């Protein structure tokens, strides 16, 4: 039987416990889970792609079926390249759905063989976003409930002044 492969795309700038929640829950449902770090042209990154990948790899090293990649192109092309049939998208709130629906519709039009599945973030992480974590970190507040220790350390270094 063919291995089931899924992709979780995102900018992960930086990875948060909300992301990790979706990754851990997805890892148990697929033979291979591929984290794809994409450049978001609408956002200026705090961490470069290599830094983000290193932070993710450290944060998910306990998951043996998870691989971290970066890709500069269309997500559906990446799915084709690795043979993934499924894209996993995390939703924090209903407000995320409209944007995600547009992405899903475009991806489906570009490649009808790839399905998108939505997973609700666990309630205790539903308010966390990378942007909010970075904003709080800039003010030297405690972010240990929102990100793994390696990410907390990296953010403190970025915002040290």
UniProtKB/Swiss-Prot annotation:
Chain coiled-coil ranges: none
Reaction(s) catalysed by this chain's protein: (R)-4'-phosphopantetheine + ATP + H(+) = 3'-dephospho-CoA + diphosphate
Swiss-Prot/TrEMBL cofactor(s): Mg(2+)
HAMAP family: PPAT_bact (MF_00151)
Binding site for ATP: 11-12, 19, 90-92, 100, 125-131
Top enzyme class: transferase
Gene this chain is encoded by: coaD
CDD domains (alphabetical): PPAT (cd02163)
Keyword Metal-binding: no
CC terms in the record's Gene Ontology section: cytoplasm
UniProt source species: Staphylococcus haemolyticus (strain JCSC1435)
GO biological process: one example: coenzyme A biosynthetic process
UniProt key word Nucleotidyltransferase: yes
Entry protein name: Phosphopantetheine adenylyltransferase
E.C. number: 2.7.7.3
Quaternary assembly: Homohexamer.
Function per UniProt: Reversibly transfers an adenylyl group from ATP to 4'-phosphopantetheine, yielding dephospho-CoA (dPCoA) and pyrophosphate.
Organism lineage: Bacteria, Bacillati, Bacillota, Bacilli, Bacillales
């Amino acid at each position: 039987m063919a291995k089931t492969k899924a992709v979780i795309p995102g900018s992960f700038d930086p990875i948060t416990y909300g992301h990790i929640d979706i990754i851990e829950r997805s890892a148990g449902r697929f033979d291979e889970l591929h984290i794809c770090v994409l450049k978001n042209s609408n956002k200026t990154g705090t961490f470069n792609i290599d830094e983000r990948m290193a932070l993710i790899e450290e944060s998910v090293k306990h998951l043996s079926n998870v691989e971290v990649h970066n890709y500069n192109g269309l997500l559906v092309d990446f799915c084709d390249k690795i043979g993934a049939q499924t894209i996993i998208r995390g939703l924090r709130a209903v407000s995320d759905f409209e944007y995600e629906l547009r992405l899903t519709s475009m991806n489906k039009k570009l490649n009808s063989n790839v399905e998108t599945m939505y997973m609700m973030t666990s309630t205790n992480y539903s308010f966390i976003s990378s942007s909010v974590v970075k904003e709080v970190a800039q003010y030297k507040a405690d972010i240990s409930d929102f990100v793994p220790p390696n990410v907390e350390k990296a953010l403190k270094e970025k915002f040290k002044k």
